[in-house]
Structure formats: C-alpha cells, structure tokens
Regions:
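Catalytic beta-strand/loop signature of glycosyltransferases that borders the donor
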Residues: 20, 99-106
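Catalytic core of nucleotide-sugar-dependent glycosyltransferases
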Residues: 39-44, 119-140, 222-235
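Acidic donor-diphosphate engagement hotspot in glycosyltransferases and nucleotidyltransferases
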Residues: 1-3
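Membrane-embedded multi-pass helical conduit in multi-pass membrane proteins
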Residues: 157-237
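Active-site-adjacent helix/loop segment of glycosyltransferases
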Residues: 119-173
Length: 253
C-alpha cells in the first residue's frame, strides 16, 4: 500500500513525495512523545503546508524521489554528517519543484525508548537546524523576486526553530512582558493557548493512539532532555543517532 500511495502522486507528475512516518512502538514515555511530535509535524509541515500550495518538509524517512531528480539535486555535492534531507529539500524547492504529501503512504518508524538516546538524537537534529536554517533566507528571496509562493512559504518554514526552542522563546517573552508590558504578555499567553489548541487538533484529526494522549503529561520532561541536547549540539555529529531496539531486553527481564 505504501508504494501504491506514493505512485498515485508520481502519476500526477510530482517528482518528490513525503509519506507519513508512524510510530512502531509506543511502549515508553519518550517513544509516545516522539510519536506525538511526528504527528504534529506531519500535519502542519506536511499535509497543511502541501495543501496551501507549498511543499511538505522532508522527514528523513518515508520519502521518495525520481532517480533523475535525486541525482540532479545531490549528485554534485559531497555531503557528510546528518542533514542530507535538509539539503535535498532546499535543492528540490529552489529548482521549482513541489514536494507532495501522501497522507496514506505510511512507513513504521522505531521510536526512541531511552533518555540518553533521545538526547543524542535531538542534539544531532538540532545541529542540522543551526547548520542549514539559513537556506530559508535564500528561498524567501527567490520567492519574492520570482513571485513564487512555494519557495516563499517553504523558506519561512525553514527559518522556524525546533519546536521546543520556539516554545521556550515564547515563554521567555511572555514572562518578560509581565514586567514590561502586561498587555503584550496577554497576547503571548493567547498565542500559547492557540498553539495548544492547534496541537490537540493535529492529534485529534489523526485518530491518535490513546497512549500518546496519556504521555502528554511528560512534555516538560521531554523539553528538559531537548534542552540537554542543545548543550551537546557542537559535538553532535560524533554521536550515533540510530535508534536502538530494547524489546529483546524486556523479554529477558
């Protein structure tokens, strides 16, 4: 079914398609919260972004391309470390292509089960954002001068920091404005309320597993470990991000 769903969009003329990365395991707090994060990003940065006329962001897995486009975008580049998907999506969109989103093309992804693995993975992924977010400026510029909505909107998305950094900046601004300007603090608070509603909406629309809803109480802990990841960003590429499987350990305990 996965390949059939991808082919529906290739048959429509698209050369790049992003599918849905669904959680294979939801047996720990971290795995369930990682699954919630994927649902949020697939809904807003995938489905919604594609349907408003831009491109779905690449998730690093569950994606497909024509061989010709892949070679055209990466064949002349020497890429080391994490972040090839960041480079690839920039090359695709800058060439005038759109990345389609296949909501029914589902690939199952093993989720992070332990905190140390979460820290190492997030450190490397945060590192790639700092390394490649500047791509957004170029795409915004091209979008403005070429009157290209796809490039302009996609460029804006590339400039947005990882979700936990975005939330922490918002919290800092709200607390600061409690002292400087209470009215602006209220605006920031309303922004948080809208975000929470939007987050729950993304989960509700996707018929989310009950275990993910039950895990939401652990969001502060999840954010804490991502802050720890931020402290390891400089040496992030030295750490492996391959998800280790611990199911066998549980069976022997």
């Amino acid at each position: 079914n996965y390949l059939l769903e991808l082919n529906k969009l290739f048959d429509l003329g698209f050369s790049a398609v992003q599918g849905v990365r669904d959680a294979k395991n939801l047996d720990t707090l971290y795995a369930a919260l990682d699954g919630a994060r994927d649902i949020y990003y697939h809904f807003y940065d995938g489905k919604l972004l594609y349907h408003v006329g831009s491109s779905a962001t690449l998730a690093g897995s569950g994606m497909a391309f024509t061989t010709q486009l892949y070679k055209e975008c990466l064949g002349h580049l020497d890429i080391t470390g994490a972040g090839f998907d960041k480079i690839l999506q920039k090359e695709i969109v800058s060439r005038g292509y759109r990345i389609a989103f296949a909501n029914e093309a589902i690939v199952f992804d093993e989720k992070t089960s332990k905190s140390d693995q979460l820290v190492n993975q997030r450190a490397r992924w945060i590192n790639t954002w700092f390394k490649y977010f500047s791509f957004g400026f170029g795409l915004i510029g091209k979008g403005i001068f070429q009157f290209n909505w796809n490039k302009f909107l996609f460029g804006l998305i590339l400039l947005r920091p990882p979700l936990f950094i975005f939330l922490l900046i918002g919290l800092f601004c709200m607390l600061l404005n409690l002292i400087l300007n209470p009215f602006l603090a209220l605006i920031w608070f309303l922004g948080f309320v809208i975000f929470i509603i939007g987050f729950i909406l993304a989960l509700a629309i996707n018929n989310t597993d009950a275990r993910i809803y039950k895990s939401l109480w652990g969001i502060p802990t999840f954010i804490f470990y991502q802050v720890l990841s931020l402290l390891k960003v400089r040496n992030a590429n030295k750490h492996s991000v391959a998800t280790k499987h611990f199911h066998a350990d549980k069976k022997t305990q």
